[in-house]
Amino acid sequence: MKSILITTFAVLASLAARDALPATPESPLRGTWTLVAAERLLPDGERVADYGASPTGRLIVDSQGRYSLQIFKSERLRFASGDKARGKTDEYESAVLGSSTHYGTVVVDAQRHTLSFRIEGASFPNWEGANQQREYTLADGVLTYRVPPRPDGAIPISVWRKLD
């Protein structure tokens, strides 16, 4: 009988402690975003298109900060064979270099104006397991962030507009 009372008390105490934990704050990025621009800021200050003239993309973030991001160059080559396993070198190159996709969790630091993407999976496997930080602005439903400089010194800039 004593062991039943102790077990019951322990279960009730753990439930009370669980309910006392503060709720995780909702991500300010929660929702669906569409890509407005994907550009590169060159070392000389010139801004150029990074994923062609009409890039497309989606960024979807849930209330806990889990995200999925896709950016595509609209001018990617179609595979002449219609078979992904039988592409030609230029078709594979266009598919890989004409897209940027990854998913994981994103943390917003509003004080420092930074986003931290904790990448779980990516089209570029070297990013998997990485924590990438970006400076951002968020105003009037438009999110703009800068990616750290590439080896050539160019800084990618992504601009997203909230859909919902």
Where are these regions (language model features)?
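A broad "ordered helical/assembly scaffold" signature
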Residues: 1, 13-14
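Bacterial N-terminal signal peptides that target proteins for export
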Residues: 1-8
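Lipid interaction determinants
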Residues: 9, 15, 20-164
